[in-house]
C-alpha cells in the first residue's frame, strides 16, 4: 500500500485511473531489433562504422547492417562536434531510427539516428513530460490486472488497458499504421475516463443531518397553487413534489433544478419558500436586477402572511438592521449576503438562483453560514442552462437533479441568420417594433475596437444608432452602473446597446427584438439565453443573427430550434464539451476520449457497472 502511494505521489496523481488518463501514451518507440530491412520501418539495427564525412552543414556516417549485410548512410543536419565524435571508424553500435531511401542516389539512409545503450523493449512516448523512462517504470509497477479490478475496472476493459501500457510489437505496428489506438482500446480509455468522472462525483457526495426538517405543508402548498392566476405545468408540479419530499427529510438535501428559458422556475422557487414555512428561506441571486425581480415576484405571489426582505450591496444600514428578525420569512439578496455578519441559524432553506454564475466557494460559503453544529440547511440550486442528456445520465446517480422542460406558454420567436448586406431587414423590423412601443437589444461582440475581430465594437457602433433613433442606452460588463442603466432602459428606453452581460435572467416585458452581431463567436447555449430575453410576455419575438460568414450550418440549425435541451445536444456536436466536471470553463474539453454527443452507450455501461460495485445512495453534494 505504501509503495502504491509513493508511486502515485511520484507521478503527481491521486489514483491509478488518474495516472492512466494523465499518462496515456501518445506514441511508441519499438526498441526491438528490426526483423527485416525494409524502408518505412522504425527500429533497432546493429551497424558497423565504415567512414565519416563532413559536408558543410551535413555529417554523413557510412555504415553497414551487420544482420542484413546492407550498406546505409546515417545523416545529421546542422550537427555539432558531439555527433562527429560519437561514431568511431571500425566500431559497432546499436542505433534506433526510421529506414528510408534517398531519392537522389537510392542509398538507404537513417536521418538523425539515436545511439542506444539498451534495447529490446518498447518505450512509451508521453506528451509534455521529460523523464519518459522513469514515468514508464513507475506506471508499469502500478499497473496490474488485480489493481485495475480494485479500481472497479471490469476484466475485459482491464486487459485492453494492459495492452496499451504493455504493448507488443504487433500492437505498436497497428498503432503506427492507424495513427491511433484500435477502436476497442479507445473504448477502454473512454470507459475509465467516465469511471474516473463518476468516482469524483461520488467522492463529493456526503450526507449531513438537516438543521431543520420542515413540516409537510401540503395544505399550505395547495392554497398557494390555487391562488396563482395560471396553471402550473406538469414539470413544475413534479419539481415541487420532489422538493417537498426533500424538505421534510432529516437529511439535508442538495438538489439541482435545471429549467429551460421561460420554463417558470420562479414559481418553483416561491413554492419552495411556502414548503419551508414557518422556517426562513435565504435566496442569493447573481445581480441586483435579478434579486429585485425575484423580490417583486415574491411580494406579488406569496401569501400575504409572508414577510419578505431585500438585501443588496450598499443597502441603507437602518433598513438592513431588521432583515433577520424573527418576523422575516424570506430574505432575497445578492453576494452582499456573504458579507453580512448576522446569525443565519434560523434559516432552513438556502436557494441559489442562476447557480452557474457563482463560484463553488461562494455557494459553499452561503451554505456554511447557515449551518449549525455540523447540521446543514436544505439547499436548492437553480439553473437556466440545460445540460446534455448524456451528462445528466452520468450525474443522476450522484446529484439529485430535476429537469423542467415544459414551457407554460409557447414562445413565438422568429430567428433569422442574416449577412451584413441584408441588414436593411433588421432596420425595418426595429423601426416597426419601436413604433409599437416595443424595445430592442443589440449585442456587440466586444466593447472596444480590435484589429483581430472584423466587426464594429460597442463604442464604435453607438453613433450609428444614436443618429437614427431616440432613447438609446449603452452598457457593458465594464460599466459600474450597468444595473442602473438596464433598469432605466426597461422603463424609458427604445434600444439597448450591450455585450452578452444581458444573457441571463433579466426580465424586459416590452422587449421584442434582439440583434446579435458575430453570433458565430458564441456557443449555442449563450445564443439561446440571449434569444430567451425576447417574447417574455407573449409578444411576437424576433432574433437576428448578423454574421459576415456566407454560410454557417450551426447557426441555421439553431435558428430552427427553440428547445433548450435539444440545443444543448446540438451544441455538443459543434464544440467541445466544456469543463462539465468542474462547472467553470465554457469551452475546451474536460473529456479527452468520451464524446458526450455519441457515447451514451458507454456512459450507461459505466454507470451500471459502477453502481453495481459501489454503495451509492441518494446523498448530497459537498460543493
Curated annotation (Swiss-Prot):
Transmembrane segments: none
Keyword terms, alphabetized: ATP-binding, DNA damage, DNA recombination, DNA repair, DNA-binding, Helicase, Hydrolase, Isomerase, Nucleotide-binding
Record remark on domains: The wedge domain within the N-terminus inserts into the replication fork junction, where the lagging and leading strand split.
Sites where the protein binds ATP: 259-266
Subunit structure: Monomer.
Start and end residues of each Helicase C-terminal domain: 422-578
Stored SMART domains: DEXDc, HELICc
Protein name per UniProt: ATP-dependent DNA helicase RecG
Function, in words: Plays a critical role in recombination and DNA repair. Helps process Holliday junction intermediates to mature products by catalyzing branch migration. Has replication fork regression activity, unwinds stalled or blocked replication forks to make a HJ that can be resolved. Has a DNA unwinding activity characteristic of a DNA helicase with 3'-5' polarity.
Keyword Hydrolase in record: yes
InterPro entries: DEAD/DEAH_box_helicase_dom (IPR011545), Helicase_ATP-bd (IPR014001), Helicase_C-like (IPR001650), P-loop_NTPase (IPR027417), RecG/Mfd (IPR047112)
EC number(s) recorded for this UniProt protein: 5.6.2.4
Annotated family: Belongs to the helicase family. RecG subfamily.
Record's catalysed reaction(s): Couples ATP hydrolysis with the unwinding of duplex DNA by translocating in the 3'-5' direction; ATP + H2O = ADP + phosphate + H(+)
Gene Ontology molecular function: ATP binding; ATP hydrolysis activity; DNA binding; DNA helicase activity
Pfam families assigned to the protein according to its UniProt record, in alphabetical order: DEAD (PF00270), Helicase_C (PF00271)
Amino acid at each position: 500500500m505504501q509503495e502504491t502511494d509513493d508511486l502515485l505521489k511520484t507521478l503527481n496523481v491521486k489514483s491509478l485511473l488518474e495516472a492512466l488518463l494523465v499518462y496515456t501514451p501518445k506514441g511508441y518507440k519499438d526498441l526491438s531489433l528490426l526483423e527485416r530491412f525494409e524502408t518505412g520501418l522504425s527500429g533497432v539495427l546493429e551497424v558497423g562504422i565504415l567512414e565519416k564525412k563532413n559536408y558543410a552543414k551535413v555529417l554523413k556516417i557510412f555504415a553497414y547492417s551487420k544482420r542484413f549485410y546492407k550498406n546505409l548512410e546515417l545523416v545529421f543536419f546542422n550537427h555539432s562536434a558531439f555527433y562527429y565524435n560519437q561514431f568511431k571508424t571500425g566500431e559497432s553500435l546499436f542505433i534506433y531510427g526510421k529506414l528510408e531511401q534517398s531519392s537522389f542516389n537510392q542509398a538507404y539512409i537513417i536521418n538523425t539516428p539515436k545511439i542506444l545503450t539498451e534495447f529490446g523493449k518498447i518505450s512509451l512516448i508521453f506528451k509534455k513530460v521529460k523523464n519518459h523512462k522513469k514515468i514508464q517504470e513507475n506506471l508499469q509497477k502500478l499497473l496490474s490486472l488485480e489493481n485495475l479490478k480494485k479500481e472497479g475496472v471490469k476484466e475485459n476493459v482491464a486487459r485492453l488497458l494492459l495492452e496499451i501500457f504493455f504493448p507488443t510489437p504487433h500492437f505498436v505496428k497497428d498503432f503506427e499504421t492507424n495513427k491511433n489506438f484500435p477502436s476497442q482500446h479507445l473504448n477502454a480509455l473512454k470507459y475509465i475516463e467516465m469511471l474516473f468522472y463518476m468516482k469524483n462525483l461520488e467522492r463529493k457526495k456526503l450526507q449531513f443531518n438537516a438543521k431543520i426538517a420542515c413540516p409537510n405543508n401540503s395544505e399550505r402548498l395547495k392554497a398557494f397553487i390555487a391562488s396563482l392566476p395560471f396553471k402550473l405545468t406538469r414539470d413544475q408540479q413534479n419539481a415541487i413534489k420532489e422538493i417537498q419530499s426533500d424538505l421534510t427529510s432529516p437529511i439535508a438535501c442538495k438538489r439541482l433544478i435545471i429549467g429551460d428559458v421561460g420554463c417558470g422556475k420562479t414559481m418553483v422557487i416561491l413554492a419552495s419558500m411556502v414548503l419551508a414555512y414557518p422556517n426562513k428561506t435565504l435566496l442569493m441571486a447573481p445581480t441586483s436586477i435579478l434579486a429585485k425581480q425575484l423580490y417583486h415576484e415574491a411580494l406579488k405571489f406569496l401569501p400575504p402572511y409572508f414577510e419578505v426582505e431585500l438585501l443588496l450591496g450598499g443597502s441603507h444600514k437602518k433598513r438592513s438592521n431588521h432583515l433577520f428578525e424573527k418576523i422575516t420569512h424570506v430574505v432575497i439578496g445578492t453576494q452582499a449576503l456573504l458579507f453580512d455578519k448576522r446569525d443565519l441559524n434560523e434559516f432552513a432553506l438556502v436557494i441559489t438562483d442562476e447557480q452557474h454564475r457563482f463560484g463553488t466557494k461562494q455557494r459553499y460559503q452561503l451554505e456554511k453560514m447557515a449551518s449549525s453544529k455540523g447540521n446543514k440547511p436544505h439547499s436548492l440550486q437553480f439553473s437556466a442552462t440545460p445540460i446534455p442528456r448524456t451528462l445528466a445520465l452520468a450525474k443522476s446517480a450522484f446529484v439529485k437533479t430535476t429537469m423542467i422542460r415544459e414551457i407554460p406558454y409557447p414562445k413565438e420567436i422568429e430567428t433569422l441568420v442574416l449577412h451584413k448586406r441584408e441588414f436593411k431587414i433588421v432596420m425595418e423590423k426595429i423601426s416597426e417594433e419601436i413604433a409599437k412601443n416595443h424595445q430592442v437589444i443589440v449585442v456587440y461582440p466586444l466593447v472596444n475596437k480590435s484589429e483581430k475581430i472584423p466587426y464594429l465594437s460597442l463604442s464604435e457602433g453607438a453613433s450609428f444608432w444614436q443618429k437614427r433613433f431616440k432613447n438609446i442606452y449603452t452598457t457593458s460588463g465594464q460599466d459600474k452602473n450597468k444595473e442602473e442603466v438596464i433598469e432605466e432602459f426597461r422603463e424609458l428606453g427604445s434600444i439597448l446597446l450591450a455585450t452578452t452581460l444581458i444573457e441571463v435572467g433579466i426580465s424586459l416585458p416590452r422587449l421584442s427584438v434582439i440583434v446579435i452581431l458575430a453570433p458565430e463567436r458564441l456557443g449555442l447555449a449563450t445564443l439561446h439565453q440571449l434569444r430567451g430575453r425576447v417574447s417574455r410576455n407573449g409578444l411576437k419575438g424576433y432574433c437576428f443573427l448578423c454574421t459576415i460568414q456566407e454560410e454557417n450550418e450551426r447557426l441555421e440549425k439553431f435558428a430552427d430550434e427553440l428547445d433548450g435541451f435539444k440545443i444543448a445536444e446540438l451544441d455538443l456536436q459543434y464544440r467541445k464539451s466544456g469543463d462539465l466536471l468542474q462547472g467553470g470553463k465554457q469551452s475546451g474539453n474536460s473529456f479527452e476520449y468520451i464524446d458526450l454527443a455519441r457515447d451514451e452507450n458507454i456512459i450507461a455501461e459505466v454507470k451500471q457497472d459502477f453502481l453495481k460495485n459501489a454503495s451509492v445512495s441518494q446523498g448530497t453534494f459537498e460543493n
